[in-house]
């Protein structure tokens, strides 16, 4: 991949933070109306449009 610029590292770090499941307390609070995160991404299958 080569050298990453600071801006690119920042974007990748944000994408990594966003790539988490919905917290259990959110599921409980919404009575299981919110159970999945539509922005979940797999590093091998999905692209980030970098």
From Swiss-Prot:
GO terms for biological process: translation. GO terms for molecular function: structural constituent of ribosome. InterPro entries: Ribosomal_eL39, Ribosomal_eL39_CS, Ribosomal_eL39_dom_sf. The keyword Ribonucleoprotein applies. Residues 1-22 are annotated as: Disordered. It comes from the Archaea. Keywords: Ribonucleoprotein, Ribosomal protein. GO terms for cellular component: cytosolic large ribosomal subunit. Belongs to the eukaryotic ribosomal protein eL39 family. This is Large ribosomal subunit protein eL39. The lineage of its organism: Archaea, Methanobacteriati, Methanobacteriota, Stenosarchaea group, Halobacteria. The gene is rpl39e.
